[in-house]
Amino acid sequence: MADRWDVSEELARLAAHIAKFRQTAGGGESEGRKLDFLIQEMNREVNTMGSKVGDAEFRWGVVEAKSCLERIREQIQNVE
């Protein structure tokens, strides 16, 4: 059961995706497709964490994170 609640791997991957997103977004070129892919990967990690953790408060955090990621995705599509 403890492994099911352990989201340390997902958090590490999410942090790596965020770092790459910042690096890519800071570049001068239009990297919309790369950014969109990174958002997709971040969303996947957030979904996995949501399915692993049963805590209601944590799940509301997952919903908020997914909402933020969707808003970022919309902004990326507007720039493309």
Where are the predicted features?
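N-terminal intrinsically disordered, cationic/polar leader segments
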Residues: 1-80
